[in-house]
Amino acid sequence: MFKAEHFDPTAWAHLFAESGAKYVVPVAEHHDGFAMYDSGLSDWTAVKMGPRRDVIGDLAKAVRAEGLHFGVSSHRVEHNFFLGVGRTIPSDVNDPRYAAFYGPAHNWLENQTPTPLNNDFTFVSSAWRDDWLARSSELVEKYHPDIMYFDWWIGQASVRPALTRFAAFYYNTSLKYGDQAGLINYKDYAMQDHSAVLDLERGQLGEIRPFPWQTDTSISNKSWGYIEHDTFKSPQFVIDQLVDIVSKNGNLLMNIGPRSDGTIPVEVQQVLHEVGAWLKINGESIYGTRPWKTYGEGPTKVASGSFHDTDTAVYTAEDFRFTTKGNTLYAIELGKPSGRETVIRSFSSGAEGAPKVDSVTLLGVDGTLTFHQQPDGLHIELPAEVPGKYAYAFRIR
């Protein structure tokens, strides 16, 4: 039974802060149509059944108390699409008693062949579109989220009139409650580059993108929610992925799946603590940085696109990713160096646009390192013991 009887929003928020997160985006409503917030537009909510509490509202207070940004995700616009197959089998979707929960689930398998992504699914009725607009606006009015994450169906042509209205309402309303306008996450071609932030689900980009973007993925290798006998990404995988994304002007939104009782699996907490420990030492190479003229160097490449993040090869000591902040350049080595020297080819004395190096520091190590900027690269002498288990960030000035 879903009761979330052990849900502790304060503990959750503290864990997220300790992990190094800067913003938290819980699911306000997923494709099942169940609102995890205090909605006045539905009886199928966490306030009126199950946990019998405003999960989103309670978490919003706790997250903001930790100094983090708070957002929400809504997947309601896909609701009648995901549940449409229920029309073809004996299921609760066909029971009029649950019509308010399942909505006008449309049997598109029988009645229409889906058109290519972002074209018009004509069965998205104006009534369903207006319902999405009302519920999305309700989230804005109740919780003033800094981020609104939407799944891909907001890109359907039949939804766009409501999307335009929502974006104007959200951006204008958010300015009343904060110093800056909120952000909308979109997928594919639902919005323009300058109007919102592109999101790639379980994927990355192969090159620097001039506009900010985001990867959303799950710490689980198999699922977005909690399942038994799950397997999880390692701290090294998460850190390497984060570094690669940031070097290309992106952010990482990492999903975790809590149990139905409101607790977060210990294995997940351990990964988050490890990532947070790395960021406590190396965070200056991540937070508030911008890409360099190239994202990095090395043999390991990442293909652009969604739904392939677990296909990435293991990074080596020859793989570096670059970030900048002011006059400081950071080179993050994704594999542990095997000897007493590491070489960054992009910073050779003859390379076009390469910096003239005055000092090199390994974050987490006192003092500066000896280096030689030569025609074949920047040669850095390493300490006898290189601390840490994961990526190694060099501060270069």
Which functions belong to the PLM regions below?
Residues 1-397:
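Mature catalytic domains of secreted/periplasmic carbohydrate-active enzymes
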